């Protein structure tokens, strides 16, 4: 593996770690209606599990409600069940093929729990970044040992790997800070 490929590979892995964090944070309820809350909901449909978005239309008519318009009348009860099983703290209110999900306001205590959870996700992502950095540094040592790169180049590339790690770590911090503000906004 050459040095350019190594840098791109590390950057790609760090980018994936950041995307995983984004996905985890989307699942945290902020007290505002967002169809992203339902990304993790799967529904038993036609003999297999399907994402909710493949059996219904999702919309947010206001800041406190999510509407789920089920396309097939026979699917309404399994959509309700899927939403309940997802354990999102939402109570479905069914009206024909339309399921309304009122978003309850968050208590201060629940907001604090969500902030702690967001910080935990951030810390897990930083651990992933450090593991990626460690793997990159081990690869650099191997390249130096195999005489593919010189000692000074190894040092220079190690600094670049560290800078890349620091950059992504600060991105994680800013994403978490932004999510914290979103959660704490009443």
Swiss-Prot record:
The record's family statement is: Belongs to the RRF family.
GO MF terms here are: ribosomal large subunit binding
Matches recorded under SUPFAM superfamilies? Ribosome recycling factor, RRF
Gene Ontology CC? cytosol
Q: Per the annotation, which location comes first and is thus the protein's main one?
A: cytoplasm
Q: Where in the cell is it found?
A: Cytoplasm
Q: Which UniProt keywords apply?
A: Cytoplasm, Protein biosynthesis
Q: What is this protein called?
A: Ribosome-recycling factor
Coiled-coil region list: none
Give all cystine bridges in this chain: none
Q: Does the keyword Protein biosynthesis apply?
A: yes
| Cytoplasm keyword on record | yes
Query: Gene for this protein?
Result: frr
- Source organism per entry reads Rickettsia massiliae (strain Mtu5)
Q: What does this protein do?
A: Responsible for the release of ribosomes from messenger RNA at the termination of protein biosynthesis. May increase the efficiency of translation by recycling ribosomes from one round of translation to another.
One GO BP annotation is: cytoplasmic translational termination
Alphabetized InterPro entries for the sequence: Ribosome_recyc_fac, Ribosome_recyc_fac_dom, RRF_sf
């Amino acid at each position: 593996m050459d040095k350019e490929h190594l840098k791109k590979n590390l950057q790609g892995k760090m980018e994936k770690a950041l995307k995983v964090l984004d996905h985890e944070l989307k699942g945290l309820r902020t007290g505002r209606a967002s169809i992203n809350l339902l990304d993790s909901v799967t529904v038993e449909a036609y003999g297999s599990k399907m994402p909710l978005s493949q059996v219904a239309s999702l919309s947010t008519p206001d800041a406190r409600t999510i509407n789920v318009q089920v396309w097939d009348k026979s699917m309404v009860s399994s959509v309700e069940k899927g939403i309940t099983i997802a354990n999102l703290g939402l109570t479905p209110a069914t009206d024909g093929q339309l399921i309304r999900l009122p978003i309850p306001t968050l208590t201060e205590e629940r907001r604090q729990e969500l902030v702690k959870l967001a910080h935990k996700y951030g810390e897990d992502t930083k651990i992933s970044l450090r593991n990626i950095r460690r793997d990159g540094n081990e690869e650099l040592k191997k390249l130096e040992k195999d005489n593919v790169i010189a000692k000074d180049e190894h040092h220079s590339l190690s600094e670049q790997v560290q800078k890349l790690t620091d950059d992504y770590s600060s991105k994680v911090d800013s994403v978490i800070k932004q999510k914290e503000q979103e959660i704490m906004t009443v």
